[in-house]
Amino acid sequence: MAFLKKSLFLVLFLGLVSLSICDEEKRQDEDDDDDDDEEKRGVFDIIKGAGKQLIAHAMGKIAEKV
């Protein structure tokens, strides 16, 4: 009976350790993904701002011709 208790304890302990390692890796992956999303948003904002300036400049040129 004591052998079964020790075996069960060992199995549960090893399961918890592996579970905590997986959770830690998952959190690191999510943090990396968040950083990538922020970089993508930053690049998109720059492109969007440049597009607005380009359109405003083009509209100004069109208005000068009219």
UniProtKB/Swiss-Prot annotation:
The keyword Transcription regulation does not apply. The modification Valine amide is found at V66. InterPro entries: Antimicrobial15, Frog_antimicrobial_propeptide, FSAP. It comes from the Eukaryota. GO terms for cellular component: extracellular region. Residues 1-22 form the signal peptide. Pfam families: Antimicrobial15, FSAP_sig_propep. One of its GO terms (biological process) is symbiont-mediated hemolysis of host erythrocyte. It is found in: Secreted. Expressed by the skin glands. Keywords: Amidation, Amphibian defense peptide, Antibiotic, Antimicrobial, Cleavage on pair of basic residues, Secreted, Signal. Its main location: secreted. Belongs to the frog skin active peptide (FSAP) family. Ocellatin subfamily. Has antibacterial activity against Gram-negative bacteria E.coli ATCC 25922 (MIC=80 uM), K.pneumoniae ATCC 700603 (MIC=310 uM) and S.choleraesuis ATCC 14028 (MIC=310 uM). Shows no hemolytic activity and no cytotoxicity. This is Ocellatin-PT4. It comes from Leptodactylus pustulatus (Ceara white-lipped frog).
